[in-house]
Amino acid sequence: MVCYPTFGGSGVVATELGMALARAGHEVHFITYSQPVRLALLEKNIYYHEVDVPEYPLFKHQPYDLALSSKLVDTIKGYKIEVLHVHYAIPHAYAGYMAKMMLKEEGIIIPMITTLHGTDITLVGSHPFYKTAVTFSINKSDIVTAVSENLKDTTFEMFEVDREIEVVPNFIDAAKYAEMQNQPCDRNLMALKEEFIITHVSNFRPVKRIKDVILVFKQILDKHPAVLVMVGEGPDRIKAERLSKELGIYSKVKFLGNSVEIDRVLCMSDLFLLPSDQESFGLAALEAMINKTPVISSNAGGLPEVNIHGLSGYVAEIGDVEKMGQYALDILKDSETLNRFKENARKAALEFDLPKILPLYVSIYEKAYKARKQNSEL
């Protein structure tokens, strides 16, 4: 399992997938430059291999893809790994292909599954400097998956892909959240009894439209007592703090920074705001929904596939903060409506429960391994 070890969606999904596979009895090896943030190393069947990138003054930028491909070769040979699953096209699929070619020289055939997560296609991959390499890496993968129908369509539109892309959506482990819901949510830690708790979780990059989050919250605050809980760090945090001060609502906005206790925040939330310019899937929305938190989102990317309009929340055009504010007020207008949306949000999230999605990946691994055996016998 090759992934980024950070708080980003692709790394979280890869880590959760690997741990679920390990619990199901499969041996899983994580190969990345630092330990993934959600990886539990003490669980059975889980191994972590750090990619060390030596510092050489000759290089202006250290060649991580070269170090990764070499580490892949050594690990695959040393542990007799049978399937390689890379998350995020650049540089992981590219390094994976180079490792495949080096192994092939030694008579070792290993299939590579590449999962596309979003910004590897829409932002990084579309850059002219990377587009050729991304196209090559996708086409040289044995199996390609995307986390939403929208991302699949976007990939075909932006790249000259000559192979099938299977859609395997991101997932949530409902059992884990069921255990948490038996524990009390201390709303008094965040808000007064009469205040609604509105939440946003992201990396605070421009694509997340943090300004829109503040503007939608201002509309809510004009009608109801409320607080806004902002979880995450990124370049637009300072702008968000400045805007909330200009609007006179800074005392009602709580900036928590990066947190490993996101679920504790979501379990006490009444509404989740996600007005992004682009979301290939919307994992943050799904995590809110499983915690019975309805979502107000834009219609960007794969969000409408996750946040069902009128059921788990509402979907509006990108940038239409007035409509988002109206939708938010509609959900918060009375306790009966709010509770209905809360229950429906969880029901919608259960469509992405881990027991439904994990067999899809296992089936893909089996298909790739079977094809590899056939190819090695030719």
Predicted segments with their positions:
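N-terminal strand-loop element at the rim of the active site
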Residues: 3-7, 19-66
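Conserved donor-binding/catalytic core segment of Leloir-type glycosyltransferases
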Residues: 145, 191-217, 229
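Carbohydrate-associated surface elements
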Residues: 150, 171
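Nucleotide-activated donor-binding/catalytic signature segment of Leloir-type glycosyltransferases, i.e.
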Residues: 241-257
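Short hydrophobic beta-strand element within catalytic cores of glycosyltransferases
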Residues: 294-297, 307
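Conserved acidic donor-binding segment of nucleotide-sugar-dependent glycosyltransferases
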Residues: 309-310, 314-321, 330-335, 350
